[in-house]
């Protein structure tokens, strides 16, 4: 398949995300229509990407699963946004992001993997913390979702690391277990779910990036310092810019 055709399909996929969500979420989300429509859309994207990767002989399951995870997390994040204007802006921002990730499906660039991991992880954590606040399901459900989601996400991000699969799975499950324990611990704090998600994201980001460089044998003291400072600055900026409060 030519790259030009793939770019056109990528644009269609990005636009369809906006159209489907907007169609069934105006003026308010109609879950019984929106969720099934999105799942059909997600299945279609997954099938197309599988076909594209196989056709170009670059099929890899963990490379393939990244975009569906991003779309699913991004879709969940839409429900957490409180106002209609913010949702509209969110959908507009989604267009170039989805097009970018879809057009580069199968790309092995390290920076692409970093960006995709960070956006997916942030959206996923905010979604899980938000849903645990608004939908009072048994706590074990959210713990299982957190463990599985983080483990699979980390495992997909480590696919290009030149080590055995067992090493990658060990790293992924270790971070998944840590994220699950952290999710359970911070849930007792009387803070807004966005604050809890930001706090968890920053800790998970630092551990993941250090683990990533450690597996590549490129971890240095300067890198550790840099990412610690970066995570701290990011936390300060997000805490200042995010409307969070102590919950009664």
Name each model-derived stretch.
Residues 14-22, 62-73, 124-135, 145-164, ...:
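Membrane-helix boundary elements
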Residues 1-105, 217-248:
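N-terminal topogenic module of multi-pass integral membrane proteins
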Residues 27-37, 83-91, 136-144, 167, ...:
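Short, aromatic-rich membrane-interface segments at the entry and exit
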Residues 74-81, 86-134, 154-158:
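Internal transmembrane alpha-helix with an interfacial aromatic "cap," most often the third helix
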Residues 2-10, 56-65, 105-125, 141-145, ...:
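Cytoplasm-facing juxtamembrane segments at the starts of transmembrane helices
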Residues 75-81, 125-137, 180-195, 235-248:
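Hydrophobic alpha-helical transmembrane segments in multi-pass integral membrane proteins
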Residues 46-54, 100-109, 129-131, 152-164, ...:
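Juxtamembrane membrane-interface segments at transmembrane alpha-helix termini
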Residues 176-179, 196-211:
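Hydrophobic alpha-helical membrane segments
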